[in-house]
């Protein structure tokens, strides 16, 4: 157990963001003693991060870390994501770089539908891949992906786009919004395409908060698969549903309690409160049951959260152990929550 308040705050930051202990300690030392460890993004930055999580929500490549994110360094007006780039893919032409290009680079089809982040443009240098929406506040920096991998992925995706009748917006308009993406700078509800973009804004605070804490999911169990999707809510927002398929290693009555404690922690968590927990931790480990945690904003912001803790063990986990080297890498990613952070609150039920 960490002995000082400063160390305990650094411990929370390390578990929540995946940064090293040295980085966490340095960051905490620079903050006022009572400040939040992970700042909330301003509105424009939150929307940018919502597009990022939406694009990565259901990965089309093999990932170990949640959505491939190793660590996060978030500020009010910017975010730096460090991605893994060492996972063998089933298809040789696939890579983490290609997944990011596919998810983030804006392109349009013959019907005017825009995929990716409208208005986003990219630059690369020795400090990473930098993404900004032209004329709007906020930025994303990608680390862990070499510039040459990014360039190769752009070429490969451009070739695939042409076969599907799609075009990158930046090819003909590198320094200004393409006419196809311009309507989504300030989307309305007049068309189905606009509504798709318009509906991201009310719950962007939640998507941003989840992205900023992606590594926290590794405290639940060995990461086997992480996916997400959204449903509309009655308050005009979106319910984010996260399914974290994991192998449980924690020897605790409620193995996900440390995660829910940190997710709602006043210092490092989201501004949410748990509303319900369907807990099946008392079921046999080999059962098909999985626990679910539900939460909503403490400030009445639109949207809701559902986290599904889908357990795999015994025969049900054998699929993920076919490649032993890969499985051992996944086991190494598991971050058990120290006992003093799991016992402060009882499980809901």
Which residues are covered by each model-predicted region?
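Compositionally biased accessory segments in Actinobacterial proteins
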Residues: 1-12, 16-349
């Amino acid at each position: 157990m960490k002995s000082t308040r400063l160390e305990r705050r650094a411990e929370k930051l390390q578990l929540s963001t995946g940064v090293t202990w040295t980085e966490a300690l340095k960051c905490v030392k620079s903050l006022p003693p009572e400040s939040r460890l992970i700042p909330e993004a301003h509105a424009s930055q939150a929307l940018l991060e919502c597009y990022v999580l939406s694009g990565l929500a259901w990965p089309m490549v093999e990932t170990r870390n949640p959505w491939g994110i190793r660590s996060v360094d978030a500020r009010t007006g910017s975010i730096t994501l460090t991605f893994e780039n060492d996972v063998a893919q089933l298809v040789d032409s696939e890579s983490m770089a290609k997944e990011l290009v596919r998810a983030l680079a804006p392109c349009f089809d013959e019907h005017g539908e825009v995929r990716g982040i409208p208005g986003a443009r990219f630059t690369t240098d020795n400090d990473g891949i930098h993404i900004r929406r032209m004329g709007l506040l906020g930025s994303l920096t990608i680390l862990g992906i070499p510039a040459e991998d990014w360039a190769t992925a752009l070429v490969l995706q451009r070739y695939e786009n042409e076969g599907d009748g799609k075009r990158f917006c930046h090819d003909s308009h590198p320094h200004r919004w393409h006419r196809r993406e311009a309507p989504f700078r300030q989307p309305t509800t007049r068309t189905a395409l606009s509504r798709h973009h318009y509906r991201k804004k009310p719950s962007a605070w939640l998507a941003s908060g989840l992205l900023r804490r992606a590594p926290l999911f590794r405290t639940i169990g060995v990461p086997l698969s992480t996916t997400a999707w959204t449903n509309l809510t009655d308050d005009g927002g979106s319910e984010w549903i996260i399914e974290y398929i994991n192998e449980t290693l924690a020897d605790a009555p409620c193995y996900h309690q440390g995660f829910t404690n940190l997710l709602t922690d006043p210092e490092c968590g989201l501004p949410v409160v748990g509303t319900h927990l369907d807990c099946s931790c008392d079921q046999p480990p080999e059962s098909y049951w999985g626990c679910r945690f539900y939460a909503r904003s403490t400030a009445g912001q639109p949207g809701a959260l559902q986290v599904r803790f889908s357990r795999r063990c015994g025969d049900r986990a054998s699929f993920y152990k076919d490649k032993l080297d890969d499985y051992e890498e996944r086991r190494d990613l598991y971050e058990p929550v120290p006992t003093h952070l799991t016992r402060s609150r009882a499980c809901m039920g």
